[in-house]
């Protein structure tokens, strides 16, 4: 965890994190004005694993995801109660540098959103903003990030071409590479393949499986087969509540809750 994440000394001691967990969510509730969107969620997120969040539209899974790096702060009516511990520090606290937090917990959205700049400039934009000016360092990070995102071989000869000239699937992998360039520990993916064709979707899934060796990944998906293919653990949300959370195979083959079984079997959603 970067020291830059803490703006000032915490008011109370940092809690020793649980072994093998990158995040600990404790009694988290999220509100939009007077409407409660997420109700008292408790869950631990494993390191170097893929955690899938599933559930019908409006169940709270994306709201929950966006709160992990405080993207909900951008919504004036949004507020959160409870704790999200990252390396033992409550990242919902007022002493948190949110910009630094979002470097360590990066996010990729449903629709690819490359900047209207070159492929190279998309990767280096945030790095330069953070003060990095050494071209050799920037070149190295660009190649490393694009390689991790399985895009380097496709674009290495046109790095200074517009990112908007890439296909939708390539643009999404570029957005992943742009996030990886900031060297996050956690990667949040909000339905990253839902707007893509089947071939691009398969590439994104293959990429996710490979990235968990270095990153802890949380993915929101409406595609239950995708959750089954790529995730190690699955959380089922319904009406803002965490109904069931466990190993993906167990959730899909022998869920403990009837609501989970009904959703998995397509009885609603």
From Swiss-Prot:
PROSITE patterns: ABC_TRANSPORTER_1 (PS00211), ABC_TRANSPORTER_2 (PS50893), PSTB (PS51238). Its main location: membrane. It is found in: Cell membrane. GO terms for biological process: phosphate ion transmembrane transport. It comes from the Bacteria. The keyword Kinase does not apply. Pfam families: ABC_tran. The keyword Nucleus does not apply. Its EC number is 7.3.2.1. Gene3D superfamilies: P-loop containing nucleotide triphosphate hydrolases. ATP binds at residues 55-62. GO terms for molecular function: ATP binding; ATP hydrolysis activity; ATPase-coupled phosphate ion transmembrane transporter activity. Coiled coil: none annotated. InterPro entries: AAA+_ATPase, ABC_transporter-like_ATP-bd, ABC_transporter-like_CS, P-loop_NTPase, PstB-like. Keywords: ATP-binding, Cell membrane, Membrane, Nucleotide-binding, Phosphate transport, Translocase, Transport. PANTHER family: ABC TRANSPORTER I FAMILY MEMBER 17. The complex is composed of two ATP-binding proteins (PstB), two transmembrane proteins (PstC and PstA) and a solute-binding protein (PstS). Belongs to the ABC transporter superfamily. Phosphate importer (TC 3.A.1.7) family. Part of the ABC transporter complex PstSACB involved in phosphate import. Responsible for energy coupling to the transport system. This is Phosphate import ATP-binding protein PstB 2. It comes from Bacillus subtilis (strain 168). The gene is pstB2.
């Amino acid at each position: 965890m970067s020291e830059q994440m803490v703006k000032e000394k915490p008011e109370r001691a940092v809690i020793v994190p649980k072994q093998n967990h990158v995040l600990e969510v404790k009694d988290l509730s999220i509100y939009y004005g007077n409407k409660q969107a997420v109700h008292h969620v408790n869950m631990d997120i494993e390191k170097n694993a893929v955690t899938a969040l599933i559930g019908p539209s409006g169940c709270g899974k994306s709201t929950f995801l966006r709160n992990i790096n405080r993207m909900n702060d951008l919504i004036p009516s949004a507020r959160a109660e409870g704790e999200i511990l990252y390396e033992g520090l409550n990242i919902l606290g007022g002493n948190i540098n949110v910009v630094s937090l979002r470097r360590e917990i990066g996010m990729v959205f449903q629709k690819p959103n490359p900047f209207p700049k070159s492929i190279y400039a998309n990767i280096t934009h945030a790095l330069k903003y953070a003060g990095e000016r050494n071209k050799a360092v920037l070149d190295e990070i660009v190649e490393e990030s694009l390689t991790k995102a399985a895009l380097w071989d496709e674009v290495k000869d046109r790095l200074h071409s517009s990112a908007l000239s890439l296909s939708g699937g390539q643009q999404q992998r570029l957005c992943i590479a742009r996030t990886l360039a900031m060297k996050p520990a956690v990667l949040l993916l909000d339905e990253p393949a839902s707007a893509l064709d089947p071939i691009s979707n398969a590439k994104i899934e293959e990429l996710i499986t490979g990235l968990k060796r270095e990153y802890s990944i949380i993915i929101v998906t409406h595609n239950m087969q995708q959750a089954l293919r790529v995730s190690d653990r699955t959380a089922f949300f319904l009406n803002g509540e965490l109904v069931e959370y466990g190993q993906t195979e167990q959730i899909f083959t022998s869920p403990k809750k009837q609501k989970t079984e009904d959703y998995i079997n397509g009885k609603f959603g």
